[in-house]
Amino acid sequence: MSVPLLKIGVVLSTMAMITNWMSQTLPSLVGLNTTRLSAASGGTLDRSTGVLPTNPEESWQVYSSAQDSEGRCICTVVAPQQTMCSRDARTKQLRQLLEKVQNMSQSIEVLDRRTQRDLQYVEKMENQMKGLETKFKQVEESHKQHLARQFKAIKAKMDELRPLIPVLEEYKADAKLVLQFKEEVQNLTSVLNELQEEIGAYDYDELQSRVSNLEERLRACMQKLACGKLTGISDPVTVKTSGSRFGSWMTDPLAPEGDNRVWYMDGYHNNRFVREYKSMVDFMNTDNFTSHRLPHPWSGTGQVVYNGSIYFNKFQSHIIIRFDLKTEAILKTRSLDYAGYNNMYHYAWGGHSDIDLMVDENGLWAVYATNQNAGNIVISKLDPVSLQILQTWNTSYPKRSAGEAFIICGTLYVTNGYSGGTKVHYAYQTNASTYEYIDIPFQNKYSHISMLDYNPKDRALYAWNNGHQTLYNVTLFHVIRSDEL
């Protein structure tokens, strides 16, 4: 900004000098000697001539003089060829000075225009600098806020991971325990091999006791391994494509070894026929099935097969029915008091999905909603024989906002939708009566899930997705403590 200001100062100083010079010098230049004729006192005219140049071409000359009858003087003069001003040296100087002043004035105008242009440029630059300074401050503040958010996110992540440190230590201890089991089994195998070679080397009762003890410990370990916290869901495997957009299919988690029957129920209301396939292979590759007719049509897609019986919600009611698939007889009915039905509190996809029956490692469950709980999800643990409610938990999650739900190890997991992008984002732990929001990706391959149930035997999720029967493997995080074995 200093260069344009210096130019302005030079212009102002030059103008002041010119003004001062003109006020002092020009009057003396303008006051030139003139030629005049004056009348003498007494009425006679005297001829008076000023100082004139001697050159006749540059001065006035008296040609003749006389008096008239009244005594007035009459003179005849000859004018010079050119005016006196044009030939006067001082007049030339004045003209030259005026020309210089005009030139300087023009230069000053040019300089002033340039100065004004520079001043405008400087003002523009000043505004740009102010704008850049403001933007820099904004960027600096935004950077600080961004760093603060990153710091908070990292701190939250650290706070989330810090409790896992002792868990990892326990997990390492559990790994050592499993390794110890493996070594004991190897030792027993070696002992049995030696015993087989040398009968009588060891006391049989003592050896049998050691084997039984190890079996109990291994069984307890396997039971602990069966439960855990859900940490991941695999991509779906499409088993079959059949039926309408809505339905359910399942296997019996308590079926004896070798019983691999599959149960298939198409539709969500006003249907009574259940298909039975001999095995998963038959279900995948053939249409050979046995049909069972239920005494009442079912409602929704929340049916389960558990220990040889099918449990379902009777259409347009809050009644649960236990139906024996072998004898084809109703073993028990029970009303879920206050439970909504007939599309009062369904899942987000609708379909009379008011009451959803589930099974996990702990037994039989019912998930529904009531007016008393403002339409939010209610979880009830049921006796699988009598259908009596053993315990109930009221959650704060609206059932109409849930896409689907399933239970693993006593924890209810809820998806945020049934179509498009889906994830598991809510979990309620019944053992602690607490909940948390989670973020577990869930691939919704066919964009319309109407049934999602967990099978503790297969440790897999069974889903009905827009006429496709699919399976998902689950990943559970296990913690086994040695004092629990």
Swiss-Prot record:
Residues spanned by motif Endoplasmic reticulum retention signal: 482-485
Keyword Coiled coil: yes
Superkingdom assignment: Eukaryota
A GO MF term: amyloid-beta binding
GO terms (BP aspect): atrioventricular valve formation; cardiac epithelial to mesenchymal transition; negative regulation of amyloid-beta formation; negative regulation of gene expression; neuronal signal transduction; positive regulation of apoptotic process; positive regulation of epithelial to mesenchymal transition; positive regulation of gene expression
Phenotypic effect of disruption: Females have slightly lower body weight than wild-type at birth, but strongly reduced body weight one to eight weeks after birth. Mutant females do not display normal estrus cycle responses to male odor, and have very low fertility due to a strongly decreased rate of ovulation and a low mating rate.
Coiled-coil segments on the chain, per record: 87-227
Disulfide-linked positions: 227-409
Signal peptide: 1-16
Pfam family membership, one: OLF
Key words, A-Z: Cell projection, Coiled coil, Developmental protein, Disulfide bond, Endoplasmic reticulum, Glycoprotein, Secreted, Signal, Synapse
Subcellular location: Secreted; Synapse; Endoplasmic reticulum; Cell projection, Axon
Entry GO CC: AMPA glutamate receptor complex; axon; axonal growth cone; endoplasmic reticulum; extracellular space; extrinsic component of postsynaptic density membrane; extrinsic component of synaptic membrane; glutamatergic synapse
Glycosylation sites noted in the Swiss-Prot or TrEMBL record: 33, 103, 187, 288, 307, 394, 431, 473
Main localization category: secreted
SMART domains the UniProt entry points to: OLF
Complex formation: Homotetramer; disulfide-linked. Dimer of dimers, giving rise to a V-shaped homotretramer. Isoform 1 and isoform 3 interact with RTN4R. Identified in a complex with RTN4R and LINGO1. Peripherally associated with AMPAR complex. AMPAR complex consists of an inner core made of 4 pore-forming GluA/GRIA proteins (GRIA1, GRIA2, GRIA3 and GRIA4) and 4 major auxiliary subunits arranged in a twofold symmetry. One of the two pairs of distinct binding sites is occupied either by CNIH2, CNIH3 or CACNG2, CACNG3. The other harbors CACNG2, CACNG3, CACNG4, CACNG8 or GSG1L.
Record remark on domains: The protein contains a globular N-terminal tetramerization domain, a long stalk formed by the coiled coil region and a C-terminal olfactomedin-like domain. Interactions between dimers are mediated by the coiled coil region. The dimers interact mostly via the N-terminal tetramerization domain, giving rise to a V-shaped overall architecture of the tetramer.
PANTHER family: NOELIN, OLFACTOMEDIN-RELATED
Miscellaneous comment: The protein structure is stabilized by calcium ions.
Function: Contributes to the regulation of axonal growth in the embryonic and adult central nervous system by inhibiting interactions between RTN4R and LINGO1. Inhibits RTN4R-mediated axon growth cone collapse. May play an important role in regulating the production of neural crest cells by the neural tube. May be required for normal responses to olfactory stimuli.
Protein name: Noelin
